Amino acid sequence: MKKITVLGGDSRLTTAAEILRGYGYEVDIPAAPCEDDYRSSDVLLLPIPTTRDGETLAAPNIKKKIYLADIARSTPDSTLILSCNYMFEGKRCIDYGKNDAYCLLNAVPTAEGAIALAIEKTPFTLWGSRALVIGCGRVGRILADRLKALGCRVTVSARKLADFALISAAGYYTAKTAEIKKHLNCDIIFNTVDVKVIEDDDFKKCTASLIVDLSSKGGFNAAAAEENGITAIKAPGLPGKTAPQTAGEILARTVRDILTTNL
């Protein structure tokens, strides 16, 4: 039986651990991880994201700081490290945050969480409203689909010609991401891209009452939006906050699939 040690204890990882036990793995979630935990494991499952500062593990439920360098030094070369948006160079490491199936499935609770925020933070129905989705990646596409199903008039921005064709074929209005300031005459904006696409001065002509940032790095200045009367919400990591059960199930299936081909 392969042993998986889970570092970090948010509800996503706790759910994933329980499901992985049901799959037949031995799973441990140490309250205070130490070098012995790293050395005795076949697999280390790290949190989402693995780090926020590039030096320590992003595990707020663990009281002491866990340094990535200590994990790398203490983990045997035979141990498989499953990380998210971080790679341990020179180690046997797989970034599950880059797994296509995981990212696509994870886009569903992200989209639902974003819609829940929009319903909560606006005084009007989504039906009949004008929604701008910045970015045509996995999250952008799933979100646009759900918004259209609720009766929104949806505009999706993209950069590539193929994406414009896809957007049009799906029945959405199109916008060039590089010219996004021309399309801010809307009711709600959802940003999914990790670069700044809306300049501070652009908010002066923006009619939206709400802008939600789903990206991890941010695509706009929230303070500038607020100064112009727009409610701005930074909302990275929504699956773990709004649907931890589903997010944990998705993670567990992803881990199982990875281990099936790598152990």
Predicted region positions:
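Residues in the short beta-alpha loop(s) of Rossmann-like NAD(P)-binding domains
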Residues: 10, 33, 85, 159-161, ...
